[in-house]
């Protein structure tokens, strides 16, 4: 999983300040509403932050419109969204905290080896939140749940960069 497993960074919430059951439910239900849009999610991130696209050797330097409809793009987008879905499914249950932490530790370590910066994790977060807020029912409660989840996720993953 490349940089977009970073999406996983955008989702959890198990470590520093665990998500409550209600917060986890908000994150999970909003994610479920868009998780079938793998290609669109990844394309939105690349469109907002071309420096993130440049971290993917198979997509670097290519026009987004020319790669968006390719099998390679769809495969990679699905890989990223599947990882995020796993992390999100585990969130909100204290007995899963170690599993979530392990996934995020590995995410940070893997991305350190690829030269991904904390700033790029922040960019990914911004693009993901923008995508979500435009494609799901987005109120203050949903925004707060996602922000808490992403704060927790970033704290763990970025610590390993």
Swiss-Prot record:
Limits of the Globin domain: 18-161
From the broadest rank down, the organism's phylogenetic lineage runs: Eukaryota, Metazoa, Ecdysozoa, Arthropoda, Hexapoda
Q: Which InterPro entries match?
A: Erythrocruorin, Globin, Globin-like_sf, Globin/Proto, Mb-like_M
Species per Swiss-Prot/TrEMBL record: Chironomus thummi thummi (Midge)
Question: Which family is annotated?
Answer: Belongs to the globin family.
Q: What is this protein called?
A: Globin CTT-VIIB-4
The UniProt keyword set, sorted, is: Heme, Iron, Metal-binding, Oxygen transport, Signal, Transport
Answer whether the UniProt record assigns the keyword Heme to this protein: yes
User: Where does the chain cross the membrane?
Assistant: none
A single GO molecular-function term is: heme binding
Quote the subunit structure annotation.
Answer: Homodimer.
Binding of heme b occurs at 76, 111
Signal peptide positions are: 1-16
Q: What further fact does the record state?
A: There are at least 12 different components in Midge globin. There are at least nine genes for VIIB variants.
- Which cellular components does GO assign to this protein? extracellular region; hemoglobin complex
């Amino acid at each position: 999983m490349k940089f977009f497993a970073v999406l996983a960074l955008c989702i959890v919430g198990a470590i520093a300040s665990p998500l409550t059951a209600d917060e986890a439910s908000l994150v999970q239900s909003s994610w479920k509403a868009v998780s079938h849009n793998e290609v669109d999610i990844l394309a939105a991130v690349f469109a907002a932050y071309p420096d993130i696209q440049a971290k993917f050797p198979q997509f670097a330097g290519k026009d987004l419109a020319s790669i968006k409809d390719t099998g390679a793009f769809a495969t990679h987008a699905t890989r990223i969204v599947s990882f995020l879905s796993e992390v999100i499914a585990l969130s909100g249950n204290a007995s899963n905290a170690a599993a979530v932490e392990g996934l995020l530790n590995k995410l940070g370590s893997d991305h350190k080896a690829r030269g991904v910066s904390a700033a790029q994790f922040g960019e990914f977060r911004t693009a993901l939140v923008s995508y979500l807020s435009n494609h799901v029912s987005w109120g203050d409660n949903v925004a707060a749940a996602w922000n808490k989840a992403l704060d927790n996720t970033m704290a763990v993953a970025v610590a390993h960069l």
